[in-house]
Design a protein with these regions (language model features):
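Divalent-cation
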Residues: 2-152
Length: 152
């Protein structure tokens, strides 16, 4: 019998920073256990996340696809309860969306970028699995982050 259930402990986290460099790379800083950890995002997801995090998505003239998804889910009775960063393979993160409904809950797997955007829009809880947390690199402003600009 496998006795490593602590590897699947959920650790609460939240978005602390969005960093952009001149090479169109983004890094998000997640606050986990009072320390900041850096996770890379592609330029599209980073741009949309910045749009949401800056408040521009609160009253847009055109909704982004993530807003349309949340509106549709709400219209059929689902609410995003939490986002879980649950797996990491190489530099790819897999996240699980937990949607609640009065009759049943459903779960979807998505990319880190989509999960962060949906979490920022819905303001639901966000967690990282301990197994993934142990693979993350601390946000090092003196090291690999020296070429990035902070836009938060």
């Amino acid at each position: 019998m496998n006795n490593n259930t602590e590897s699947f402990e959920l650790i609460e986290c939240h978005l602390e920073k969005i960093i952009f460099d001149e090479n169109s790379d983004y890094v998000v800083g997640l606050n986990i256990r009072e320390e900041i950890y850096g996770l890379k995002l592609n330029s599209y997801d980073g741009t949309i996340l910045t749009f949401v995090d800056s408040g521009c998505a609160e009253n847009p003239h055109i909704n982004i696809i993530h807003q349309i998804l949340l509106q549709f889910k709400k219209s059929v009775g689902f609410e995003l309860q939490r986002v879980i960063i649950e797996a990491k393979y190489g530099d790819v993160f897999y996240c699980r969306l937990h949607w609640s409904h009065e009759k049943q809950d459903i779960y979807n797997v998505c990319s880190l970028g989509d999960a962060l955007i949906l979490q920022a829009l819905s303001e639901c809880d966000m967690f990282v699995v301990d197994f993934v947390f142990k693979q993350l690199d601390k946000f090092d402003e003196d090291g690999f982050m020296s070429n990035f600009e902070d836009y938060t």
